[in-house]
């Protein structure tokens, strides 16, 4: 039977410890400035993140003008637009405390309709748009995760230490070649269990089998230059995604990806015109789940143990039987 290592009160204190340490180090090591973020954007701007392309945003109209607005899914596009508007230069970046609602999320131990993450974005030069630069950035972020685990171990030694010294890089195609008989999700479990920490490169495009490792919107990540950070979760005994990130599309890759997904209508949106006409800066960015981070480092079995959300009665009952106490 699962037993949380902390009381609810102790957990709340530790959550602040996790978030404060990580935010401070993320800003310092990636040279990011914190900015205020929107909870909603106009529909016509095209700034909302449409994730895998099928999730429905929450829509409402504004009394004053009748304009249609959308609650954000993430700030993947907004951040790039903001870097342009605020006059940032190559090597400079921003981050924000992003809160979102994803109404179509399938609820389970690691997914909630409420999303909280550190959303960050940084301007890059054309020659930086390489797998090597992507990997260097991943190593920087992984270094923060390692130091966070050490920091928490000093305060809460009973949490233990599980992260390996190094994170392993693997492409989604290499994973398919290694585990052709497994589903993409099971491949993630296998590789994360083997190494403890992995970064899967290249998500969104079709593999040689014709299947995708996972879906990605066509208009923010370059599918050849993106990926996910996965850890092996010691309590759940499964792979556990901490971050999705990548070098963003330039005019060439955006044009190709919009054509592949049959979304040519998006070319008329302000954001997409900015990419296709080389107005918006080239960037790298990502989202790092705050509740996911707390769930991993505080060794929790359910995301509802580290965030306040709404859960169906049957799910709450099931958790109660497993000795999992949701906020």
From Swiss-Prot:
Q: Which organism is it from?
A: Bacillus cereus (strain AH820)
- Pathway involvement? Amino-acid biosynthesis; L-asparagine biosynthesis; L-asparagine from L-aspartate (ammonia route): step 1/1
GO terms in the biological process aspect are: L-asparagine biosynthetic process
Subcellular localization(s) per the UniProt record: Cytoplasm
Major place of localization?
A: cytoplasm
**The UniProt record lists the keyword ATP-binding:** yes
Q: What class of enzyme is it?
A: ligase
Q: Could you name the domain of life of the organism this protein comes from? A: Bacteria
Q: Which family does it belong to?
A: Belongs to the class-II aminoacyl-tRNA synthetase family. AsnA subfamily.
- UniProt keyword annotations, A-Z: Amino-acid biosynthesis, Asparagine biosynthesis, ATP-binding, Cytoplasm, Ligase, Nucleotide-binding
What cellular component GO annotations does this protein have?
A: cytosol
Q: List the disulfide bonds.
A: none
**What's the name of the protein?**
Aspartate--ammonia ligase
Reactions catalysed, semicolon-separated, are:
L-aspartate + NH4(+) + ATP = L-asparagine + AMP + diphosphate + H(+)
Report the EC code(s) recorded for this entry. Answer: 6.3.1.1
Q: Give one GO term, molecular function aspect.
A: ATP binding
NCBIfam families the record matches: asnA
The record, for InterPro entries, names:
aa-tRNA-synth_II, aa-tRNA-synth_II/BPL/LPL, AsnA
């Amino acid at each position: 039977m699962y037993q949380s290592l902390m009381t609810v009160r102790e957990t709340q204190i530790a959550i602040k410890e996790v978030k404060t340490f990580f935010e401070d180090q993320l800003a310092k090591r990636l040279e990011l400035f914190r900015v205020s973020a929107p909870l909603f954007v106009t529909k016509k701007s095209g700034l909302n993140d449409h994730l895998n392309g099928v999730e429905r945003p929450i829509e409402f109209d504004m009394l004053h003008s009748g304009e249609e607005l959308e609650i954000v899914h993430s700030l993947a596009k907004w951040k790039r637009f903001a870097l342009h508007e605020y006059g940032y230069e190559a090597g400079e970046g921003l981050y924000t405390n992003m809160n979102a609602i994803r109404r179509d999320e399938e609820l389970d131990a690691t997914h909630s309709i409420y999303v909280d993450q550190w959303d960050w974005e940084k301007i890059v030069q054309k020659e930086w748009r390489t797998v090597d630069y992507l990997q260097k950035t991943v190593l920087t972020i992984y270094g923060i995760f390692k130091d966070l685990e050490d920091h928490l171990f000093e305060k809460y030694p009973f949490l233990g230490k599980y992260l390996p010294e190094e994170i392993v890089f693997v492409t989604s195609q290499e994973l398919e070649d290694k585990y052709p008989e497994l589903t993409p999700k099971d491949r993630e479990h296998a590789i994360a269990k083997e190494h403890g920490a992995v970064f899967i490169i290249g998500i969104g495009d079709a593999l040689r089998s014709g299947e995708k490792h996972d879906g990605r919107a066509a208009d923010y990540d370059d599918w050849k230059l993106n990926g996910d950070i996965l850890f092996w979760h010691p309590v759940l005994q499964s792979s556990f995604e901490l971050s999705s990130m990548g070098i963003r599309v330039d005019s060439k890759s955006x044009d190709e990806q919009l054509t592949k997904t049959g979304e040519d209508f998006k070319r008329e949106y302000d954001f997409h015109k900015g990419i296709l006409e080389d107005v918006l800066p080239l960037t790298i960015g990502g989202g790092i789940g705050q509740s996911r981070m707390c769930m991993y480092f505080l060794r929790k079995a359910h995301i509802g143990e580290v965030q306040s959300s709404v859960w169906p009665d049957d799910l709450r009952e099931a958790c109660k039987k497993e000795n999992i106490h949701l906020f």
